[in-house]
């Protein structure tokens, strides 16, 4: 059984991380620099 505290941290941290990445990518795209999206 997973510890409730660890489970709560993971469930709270993952959506925030995904949202942060999406916001960062959207802000960079909004600034007019879509050329760096397909370089990886």
UniProtKB/Swiss-Prot annotation:
Lineage summary: Bacteria, Bacillati, Cyanobacteriota, Cyanophyceae, Gloeobacterales
Subunit structure, interactors included: The 4 large subunits of the cytochrome b6-f complex are cytochrome b6, subunit IV (17 kDa polypeptide, PetD), cytochrome f and the Rieske protein, while the 4 small subunits are PetG, PetL, PetM and PetN. The complex functions as a dimer.
Annotated function: Component of the cytochrome b6-f complex, which mediates electron transfer between photosystem II (PSII) and photosystem I (PSI), cyclic electron flow around PSI, and state transitions. PetG is required for either the stability or assembly of the cytochrome b6-f complex.
NCBIfam families: PRK00665.1 (NF001907)
Name used for this protein in its record: Cytochrome b6-f complex subunit 5
Record's keyword terms, sorted: Cell inner membrane, Cell membrane, Electron transport, Membrane, Photosynthesis, Transmembrane, Transmembrane helix, Transport
UniProt-listed GO biological process terms: cytochrome complex assembly; photosynthesis
GO MF annotations in UniProt: electron transporter, transferring electrons within cytochrome b6/f complex of photosystem II activity
Topology relative to the membrane: Single-pass membrane protein
